[in-house]
């Protein structure tokens, strides 16, 4: 962690999102009929670098933040939201997921596989995959704006907490508290 610099994150996210988009495009454009393996398992396995970078970034941003890291977070919030929207609003990809979901009872899936299929289908539906194109576009805009506002709010809370504190100058003010505190 000590070698990671805030400036590393934006290009790392850019590369990871490009790779993830390529994986998603290959799944969506697969000419074979959708199967659990070529659609759901492939979708679940996609974006590993993106997920790893996201976890590291979000943990650092929440616990060991800095002005540079917060600037990267503000820049990336709408872009990562747009990335998620692009996947969840991909009509060809959703058609594959939806086709499998429609015949899930006949697929002979293990309980974990069925749960993954149902969860992914629900994620697409909640993101607006069934909406008309204009409504999907608007839902995406709202999601990107919410990502920006959520980031701003979280950063404001962190800044507020960093400036808050109680100075105890009289030991009697600690009366009644356990010694471990």
Describe these PLM feature segments.
Residues 1-181:
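Zn2+-dependent metallopeptidase catalytic domains
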């Amino acid at each position: 962690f000590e070698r990671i610099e805030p400036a590393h994150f934006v290009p790392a996210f850019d590369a990871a999102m490009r790779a993830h988009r390529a994986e998603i495009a290959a799944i969506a454009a697969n000419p074979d009929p959708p199967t659990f393996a070529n659609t759901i398992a492939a979708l679940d396995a996609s974006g590993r670098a993106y997920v790893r970078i996201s976890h590291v970034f979000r943990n650092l941003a929440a616990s060991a933040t800095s002005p540079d890291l917060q600037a990267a977070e503000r820049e990336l919030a709408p872009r990562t939201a747009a990335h998620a929207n692009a996947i969840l609003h991909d009509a060809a990809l959703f058609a594959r997921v939806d086709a499998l979901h429609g015949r899930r009872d006949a697929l002979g899936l293990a309980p974990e596989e069925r749960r993954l299929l149902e969860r992914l289908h629900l994620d697409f539906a909640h993101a607006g995959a069934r909406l008309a194109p204009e409504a999907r576009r608007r839902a995406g805009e709202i999601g990107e704006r919410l990502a920006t506002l959520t980031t701003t709010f979280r950063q404001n809370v962190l800044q507020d907490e960093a400036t808050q504190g109680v100075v105890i100058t009289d030991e009697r003010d600690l009366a009644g508290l356990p010694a471990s505190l």
